[in-house]
């Protein structure tokens, strides 16, 4: 079913499927760890009821 004939053909198919889609801008909902001056980070984990 999925027989590879050449790696170039596979790369072309992958490029066509991906379409170079990606994250062009930074996601505002993404959480990022904040570091202090010493380079240490901390987080508070809260469990919802």
UniProtKB/Swiss-Prot annotation:
Keywords from the named record: DNA damage, DNA recombination, DNA repair, DNA replication, DNA-binding, Metal-binding, Zinc, Zinc-finger
GO molecular function, one term: DNA binding
GO biological processes: DNA recombination; DNA repair; DNA replication
Keyword Ribosomal protein belongs to the record: no
Functional note: Binds preferentially to single-stranded DNA and therefore, destabilizes double-stranded DNA. It is involved in DNA replication, repair and recombination. Binds ss-DNA as the replication fork advances and stimulates the replisome processivity and accuracy.
Note: Interacts with the polymerase and the uvsX and uvsY proteins.
Subunit field text: Homodimer in the absence of DNA, monomer when binding DNA.
Protein name: Single-stranded DNA-binding protein
Organism: Enterobacteria phage RB9
């Amino acid at each position: 079913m999925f027989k590879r004939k050449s790696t170039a053909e596979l790369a072309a198919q992958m490029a066509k499927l991906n379409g170079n889609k990606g994250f062009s801008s930074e996601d505002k909902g993404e959480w990022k760890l904040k570091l202090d001056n010493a380079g240490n980070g901390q987080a508070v984990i809260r469990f919802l009821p």
